[in-house]
């Protein structure tokens, strides 16, 4: 099959899978837990605006291992948002990805981090997200996998489902 002048065998390509960061790959609460009380009070109601908070966060349980397993069958990208009023969040998210997945050209997410408030603009087969009705996820063309839902409460359930679909 030809696509825009490039010869491709569509059936041989991996499906595209986007993965959200906050509360999917990254345990947002772990960053909050590391803040001092003064900062928690100052930023109450908008803790994602705390400068540097994203650098403090730990991975969700087994998230890193699960992603490596999914990479065997899928073409992976991270698709996340970053708070508009917290410029450090944009940098911290990139640094978090480098810390947990590497930063050389052969690393899993090298130049595969997309930060957007319009997830619907990305075309793919699957999106794993904990907020399926926010930031365009509800208009995503592929299937949205609602992380931390009854059907997909954890990474184990997500991996089992997606490995069957690959």
Q: Where are the regions that the model predicts?
A:
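Short catalytic/ligand-binding loop motif for oxyanion handling, primarily in non-cytosolic enzymes
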Residues: 26-29, 78, 85-89, 121-123, ...
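Short, Lys/Arg-enriched N-terminal segments with co-localized hydrophobic residues
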Residues: 1-11
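Acidic, Mg2+-coordinating phosphoryl-transfer loop and its flanking beta/alpha structural elements
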Residues: 126-159
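Conserved Lys-Pro-Asp/Glu-containing loop-to-beta segment of HAD-superfamily phosphomonoesterases
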Residues: 16, 108-136
């Amino acid at each position: 099959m030809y696509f825009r002048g490039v010869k491709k065998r569509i059936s041989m390509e991996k499906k595209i899978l986007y993965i959200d960061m906050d509360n999917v790959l990254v345990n947002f609460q772990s960053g909050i837990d590391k803040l001092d009380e003064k900062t928690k009070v100052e930023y109450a109601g908008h803790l994602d605006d705390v400068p540097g908070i994203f650098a403090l966060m730990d991975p969700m349980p087994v998230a890193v291992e699960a992603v490596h397993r999914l990479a065997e069958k899928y073409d992976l990208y991270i698709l996340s948002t970053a708070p508009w009023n917290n410029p450090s969040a944009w940098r911290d998210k990139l640094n978090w990805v480098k810390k947990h997945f590497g930063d050389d050209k052969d690393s899993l997410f090298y130049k595969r981090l997309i930060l957007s408030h319009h997830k619907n603009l990305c075309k793919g087969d699957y999106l794993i997200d904990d907020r399926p009705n926010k930031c365009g996820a509800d208009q995503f063309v592929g299937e949205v996998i609602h992380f931390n839902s009854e059907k997909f409460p954890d990474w184990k359930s997500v991996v089992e489902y997606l490995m069957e679909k690959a």
